[in-house]
């Protein structure tokens, strides 16, 4: 069995699957809350507690697996577009040029990072000349990679894939056939994936299925939850945002979150537009469905843009077995396995 392990500052998510030819069968899903301070911005602060929580979760749900999949998406990842001469073809030579670029312009020690790069496709708005190759470079701190490898070892799992969430979402987009029972071909649009949680806002932007840029803000909706002290009030957030309800501190927390979210999303889209000459057609919001559809509706109204809260998804060649069923909070973990199946 293949198991994807996804965790935020507040929760851990497990998705177990098996692959049969080109089909991915998702057989088990489980999640648990994490004590405060165990994980911070994707960094493992307390590896013993994290290992214990995951081990208990696996035991409770009778989960067995051999391989572990991880994906990373946080502020410590450096993503930068680098142009190199088309004549440079050898990977070692390219890595040397990329390392020099990072050291010169970002003032980092490249030996402390795991560096990956992939060629970017030219677009009609900003075509490259024939003598230049454009690369998207990712630099991940080695210390974080070692934390994840250590976690897999402590769980007695083989770390099969260590990836970036931006890459896994790219493959996820390819498999989507419908969202909220409406047919979608997301690889034919310019789309934004917006991940909302208690602790962060993650934005990933794609042009016709190809990753362009991402941005991560440590600004979750935790304060909103602390003032929405009952479920009925949580369901009325759009009314709070539009001043139809006077809720004092909740209104203030919501207004601050919306302002920060708007700026974060627009700043990320501005970079996307500067790189491609295009704008995002639709933003797809995912996370805890009890609050995300409310926040998506507020962003749609506030920004006059298309924000769609993901409630269900139909995939190509992805099957749900037993008690496993779609849940938007598990999209990042599911995307890890879909990337492997591709």
Regions found by a protein language model. Name each.
Residues 63-75, 152, 158-161, 275-288:
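Short glycine-rich phosphate-binding loop at a beta-alpha junction
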Residues 3-6, 11-28, 64, 70, ...:
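Small-residue (GG/TT-enriched) beta-loop-alpha framework at ligand/catalytic clefts
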Residues 223-280, 288:
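Adenine-nucleotide phosphate-binding core of ATP-dependent small-molecule kinases
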Residues 72-177, 312-316:
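Active-site neighborhood for divalent-cation/phosphate handling
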Residues 1-101, 105, 146:
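Non-catalytic, solvent-exposed interaction/assembly segments
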Residues 278-305:
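Glycine-rich phosphate-binding loops at beta-strand->alpha-helix junctions
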Residues 49-62, 179-189, 268-269:
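Phosphate-interacting basic helix/loop segments used at nucleotide- and nucleic-acid interfaces
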Residues 310-342:
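Glycine-rich phosphate-binding/hydrolytic loop that grips phosphoryl groups
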